[in-house]
Amino acid sequence: LAFPRSIAPERLALAALLGVTAGAAVLTSLAKANSQEIGVYSGRHYNTDKALYKQFSQKTGIKVKLLEAKDDALIERIKREGANSPADVLVLADAARLDKAADAGLFRPSRSASLNRDVPANLRESKGLWFGLTRRVRVVVVNPKAVNPSSIRSYADLAKPAFKGQLCLRNRKSVYNQSLVADQMILRGDKAASAWVKGMTANVTQPYFSSDTPLIRAVANGQCGVGLVNSYYVARMLAGGSGASDQQLANRVKVRFPDPAHVNITGAGVVKTAKNPEAALRLIEFLASPSGGRGYAEANNEYPLRGFGNNAALKRLGTFKADGVSAQQMGAKNKAAVALMQAGGWR
């Protein structure tokens, strides 16, 4: 067999060798992608989250190793673990906790065109340290037998003398209330926010609650006329997520969205010591996307980053106009908010 002069045997051998080498490189790259694993530390605890992580793994070949615990405990754990932490992604509820983790140097900045597109600017950290994934609203629950729901149009109304002996509040340790106060300080100024807090504490009728769910029960049972809670607690009860008895109680109360409404977030960032930051960012992009984010929000009866979603229980609550306050500014104001609450008698 004779070869043309232009394609000598040694050249064919070299081409074949290069082809094998290139093919091996591609296979090695694919194998590496398929063997990737990221550690996710999450303050959330819902089975539907695990289903979303599985969906992400099937789509990308990146495995997710999940650790769930309380938010503050996760922050302290990563601090202790230092450079040896297996965490690549940290998921936390509330802007104040995200800011706390950022201040502790736990996040690394990330740049992502899709996150800039999918996450509104006021719901992400300006340097890309963390990004909002879901929204929740601090709403007013009303017992219509005790209080006319239409008498409440804003958070400021709760400080009016007309509500003396009617108001129930969660205690000062609640990060949700701390962020609400920070929000009002940004919107209305420290002086007005201080007067508002003092007016509300003068109206409190029951000992301060440690959680939102028992507060909703108290309003439904007539122990309070009004109370402040996160929207998803009411939606969860309406959907029967905490039992038939709570579902009946939730149907007794009316929900008022103050105009404008304080919006907080669940968010996530890439951990500074992440072993696989690129894959970690891909997960956050997936969770913030319209498809992934919808499931992440509905798991806890929260709102997606844009719009109001299709959650039946949330639809029953109605719609709201967000106040547009920056979650980053709100988180940074946390210590000042706690001090203002303490000075105003919020126990």
Residue ranges and their predicted role:
Residues 1-37:
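Short, low-complexity disordered leader/linker segments with a strong preference
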Residues 191, 302-347:
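An extracytoplasmic/periplasmic, membrane-proximal ligand-sensing/linker region
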Residues 139-146, 264-276, 295-296:
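A bilobed periplasmic-binding-protein/Venus flytrap-type ligand-binding module shared by bacterial periplasmic
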Residues 136, 165-173, 197-201, 206-209, 247-272, 286-310:
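Periplasmic-binding protein-like
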Residues 43, 47-50, 69-73, 85-223, ...:
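Extracytoplasmic ligand-binding site segments that recognize negatively charged/polar headgroups
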Residues 43-63:
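Short, polar/charged alpha-helical segment
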Residues 29-39, 57-60, 160-162:
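Immediate post-signal peptide segment of exported/extracytoplasmic ligand-binding proteins
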